[in-house]
UniProtKB/Swiss-Prot annotation:
Its EC number is 2.7.6.5. This is GTP diphosphokinase CRSH1, chloroplastic. The calcium-binding sites of the 2 EF-hand domains are required for enzyme activity. Activated by calcium. It is found in: Plastid, Chloroplast. Residues 119-219 form the HD domain. Residues 1-13, 40-66 have a biased composition (Low complexity). The keyword Chloroplast applies.
Length: 583
């Protein structure tokens, strides 16, 4: 997620008679500077719009229109493109696009001031997590707006009137969930389990997922809290929210919540596990890559498998620090007995042919036979959930392989074999398998929750489904951001349409005219799709440069601090001012 591109704008001109009052009016006494009336290329406009305006203690400096309203448009378009790009094709309908666009227009001016853009960055990071989980536009919109709602920058009435009742309902439910742990006097296993079941039974499942994304963002930025609060929050997440993430099928999110909680609750133990796993990963990386290549080639070369499978992918598997700790400490295993240090997952996509319904299981078993011919299978360790699925419907074939060589002992390699459909069922939002990891061991309870989740998803899909007649204009438009700005559907963005979005963002008509002048290459007074796409390309370039700058800054800060602490360099703040600080 590009965080640098979401840095809040400086004071923004509000001229043009805004359609809505915003909570952050222009500071009195500051007047915007005008750009020279020169014909500038699109990259100059994007650079002016996307880069952060310089700030100083002097009250005489203010933002240019391109640095104000134009920059907000760049943020709006960039964020919109990223979120719709993360959503699946089936989710990014034109109805969904309109909803996301409205949510971003409401959130951007509400979050642009106050803390250097951190609130806006958090809101967009949460929205990106929800998009990665393939949630619908209502949930993603609620994720965008929750930060502004918590800060008091918008009200629930604003959400209802400008976004919709369904999104407001999700926000209301997530706020109730936020305070659910306060109902517990003691956070023991029994109480935590009861609270998890209560949350899954009495709250909107999509609001639960929204709250999980919020907790993940909180855990990623826990360093800013006092030590005792870090531990309290981490214990709460480990006992309640990480198992909830398993229960709703968000397995990767659950793993990250567990590992972050482990890191703050038991930092020394976490460091030991992390260093050991990193050493194992470094030592075995070339080995794993070699095994993946060998296996993939063997599967592709098999004639029998090629007849029933159209695609094969082999993935590595993330090594959970928390799970590894439990195996070593709770289960009492020795390091050499931790068998998923070397781990692969084979995902097969059977050919689409209704004449044979058993091609998926056949492909899994044929893959198993090929693996047996390549390596030594460990007797008694194979688990065939393809032929005999678990009660909750989980299907996969698990194999343990001995890859040791004479004089060179290695950990066992675990390989999971499943079809694409089985994989979706196992790790997606429809997987009852995850409900067991979430503490719901009753199959009937798991099936009931699955039915609730599917019903909620179907209801949202019906609301956001495109209507052929009303959405015909949008369906013919390939650039979703352009469609949202081209209100009348004539294939061009007029100055009136650009002014309208500027006013929605808290800027004004002067900013719109300035941005139009910068982007309108043929001077016809409007923006064509080609001119707008050139602007979009430059926005993405600026966002990627900001991302790289942020990464380089962190690397250099760490390296220069190390050098400075060793006494190898001395930097005088008085000489360099704020240009280079090594502390």
């Amino acid at each position: 997620m590009a965080t640098a591109a979401t840095t809040s704008a400086a004071a923004i001109p509000t001229g043009g008679g805004g359609r809505r009052q915003h909570p952050h009016p222009r500071r009195p006494g500051l007047r915007p500077r005008r750009l020279h009336r020169l014909r500038l290329p699109a990259q100059a406009a994007a650079a002016a719009a996307a880069s952060s305006p310089s700030t100083s203690s002097s009250s005489s400096s203010s933002s240019t229109p391109a640095e104000g309203g134009g920059r907000l448009v760049a943020e709006l378009v960039g964020a919109f493109n990223e979120l719709t790009g993360r959503m699946g094709e089936g989710l990014a309908t034109s109805s969904s696009s309109r909803l996301l666009f409205r949510a971003l227009k409401l959130a951007l001016p509400a979050l642009r001031d106050g803390d250097g853009g951190r609130a806006l960055a958090r809101a967009l990071a949460i929205a990106a997590s929800l998009a990665d989980l393939q949630m619908d536009a209502e949930v993603i919109s609620a994720g965008i707006l929750r930060e502004a709602l918590d800060a008091g920058a918008i009200s629930m009435r604003d959400v209802k009137s400008e976004i919709g009742i369904s999104t407001a309902h999700l926000l209301h439910e997530s706020l109730r969930l936020k305070h659910a742990p306060s109902k517990l006097d003691v956070l023991d296993d029994e109480s935590a389990s009861a609270l998890r079941k209560f949350c899954l039974s009495y709250y909107d499942i999509r609001a639960v997922i929204l709250e999980l994304a919020l907790k993940l963002d909180m855990m990623r930025h826990l360093d800013c809290l006092p030590r005792y609060l870090q531990r309290i929050k981490s214990l709460e997440v480990l006992k309640i929210y990480a198992p909830l993430a398993h229960a709703v099928g968000a397995g990767n999110l659950s793993l990250e919540l567990e590992d972050l909680s482990f890191r703050y609750l038991f930092p020394h133990s976490y460091d030991h596990i992390d260093q050991w796993l990193r050493s194992q990963e470094t030592e075995n990386k070339l080995l794993i890559d070699s095994y993946k290549e060998q296996l993939l080639q063997a599967l592709k070369d098999d004639d029998e498998l090629s007849q029933i499978v159209q695609d094969i992918s082999i993935q590595g598997r993330y090594k959970s620090r928390f799970s590894t700790m439990k195996k070593l400490v709770k289960d009492g295993r020795k390091p050499e007995e931790v068998n998923d240090i070397l781990a692969l997952r084979v995902i097969l996509e059977p050919r689409c042919d209704g004449s044979s319904l058993d091609w998926g299981p056949r492909a899994c078993h044929r893959t198993h036979e090929i693996i047996q011919a390549m390596w030594k299978e460990v007797p008694g360790r194979t688990k065939n959930y393809v032929t005999r699925p678990k009660e909750n419907g989980y299907q996969s074939l698990h194999v343990a392989i001995d890859v040791s060589e004479p004089g060179k002992m290695r950990p066992l390699m675990e390989i999971q074999i499943r079809t694409k459909e089985m994989h979706k069922f196992a790790v997606g939002g429809e997987a009852s398998h995850s409900l067991y990891k979430g503490g719901l061991t009753d199959p009937g309870e798991a099936k009931r929750l699955k039915a609730i989740m599917l019903a909620a998803a179907e209801l949202a899909a019906m609301r956001l489904r495109d209507l052929p007649a009303s959405d015909q204009g949008d369906s013919n438009c390939t650039n979703r951001a352009f469609c949202q700005l081209d209100k009348n559907g004539d294939g061009r963005i007029s100055i009136e349409e650009l002014t309208e979005v500027m006013e929605d963002l808290g800027a004004g008509g002067k900013d719109a005219k300035e941005l139009m002048h910068l982007l309108d290459a043929n001077s016809d007074g409007s923006l064509s799709s080609d001119e707008f796409e050139a602007f979009q390309r430059q926005i993405e370039l600026m966002r990627s440069l900001d991302d790289k700058d942020d990464r380089y800054r962190k690397i250099l800060k760490e390296k220069l601090q190390t050098i400075d602490s060793a006494g190898l360099i001395q930097v005088y703040r008085k000489q360099l001012g704020d240009k280079l600080l090594v502390s």
